[in-house]
Amino acid sequence: MYSLARPFLFSLDAERAHGLGLSALDLAYRTGTTPLLAARIAPMPSTVFGLTFPNPVGLAAGLDKNGEHIDALFALGFGFVEIGTITPRPQAGNPQPRLFRLPAHNAIINRMGFNNAGVDALVRNVERARNRRGMLGINIGKNKDTPNEQAADDYIACLDKVYPLADYITVNISSPNTAGLRELQEETSLRQLVSQLRERQESLAARYGRRVPMLVKVAPDLSERDIDAAARVLGELQVDGVIATNTTIDHSKVAGDPLANEAGGLSGAPVLEQSTLVLRRLRARLPESMPLIGVGGILSGADAVAKMAAGAALVQCYSGLIFRGPSLVSECVEAIRRRREAPSRGAVAPL
């Protein structure tokens, strides 16, 4: 069915199509017609971060920034859904247009800029969700006008409010669309920020009697030296996991496209190779006990298997969902299942 709707959606402005697509998913969920869009997925339990995921394929942050579509998204068969990025205060993000499709490359460029309704609105939306069929991740960030020296205050403000509701929390320090944000990945800044967040995480765990895993999401544009430094810091501070990766600022693989020079982060097929390379390097440098989520360029089951082979315990997609539709979810799960059941065909770590 998505193949029929896609030409219409792609004829619209990308951000308008985004909103209409989510509204259509909500309608399908309310009317019980989601099975027309997405195949039923047999369980494939995967225990990671001490949590049991119904299957290892999730939705990356960015599609549902405010947690308004949680039930409808879980109905597509995702083993986990990550909402956000959310900030302490509402913000409009960057001026439109700010979202661009590059169909010839199965790619998207976005410069959204953490547009969201604020953490309090997200909390209300999560509390209204009634059918969480998998694990819910909440991705947190800082407001655009908060200087990096005070970034920890923003992350802690979000952490405090979403902690009771999240199954895991992602610290987003890698979006290219908030000026200066990626500087928080530099070794000294990273250590200062994550140490404060780890301290608050332990305090919240004691308060609520429940330890919610905290992950850090990194960029695909890190040098080998940066990867080494990040792995050293995150390993020493014992974060629960790492998500590799966010979008890239390198548009060389879409050179020649009419939209290639639009500012923003590039996602989709062109980022697969580099994001998987960063994933593999992190896996080699981080403690074996620290799981990784692989995201970036997954447009097929084979791409998902490649992420697992590179060291991911779980995978996420977003751009692939735009180009392939909901059938991508079941395709990825089944590809991972086949490889898991036939380990002699390739090295995918046990889930």
From Swiss-Prot:
Positions annotated to bind FMN: A61, G62, L63, D64, K65, T85, N139, N172, K217, T245, G268, G297, Y318, S319
Function: Catalyzes the conversion of dihydroorotate to orotate with quinone as electron acceptor.
Keyword Membrane: yes
Identification of the protein by name: Dihydroorotate dehydrogenase (quinone)
Class of enzymatic activity (EC top level): oxidoreductase
Membrane-protein topology: Peripheral membrane protein
Pathway it works in: Pyrimidine metabolism; UMP biosynthesis via de novo pathway; orotate from (S)-dihydroorotate (quinone route): step 1/1
Record-linked CDD domains: DHOD_2_like
Organism for this UniProt entry: Stenotrophomonas maltophilia (strain R551-3)
Family classification: Belongs to the dihydroorotate dehydrogenase family. Type 2 subfamily.
Domain of life (superkingdom): Bacteria
Encoding gene per record: pyrD
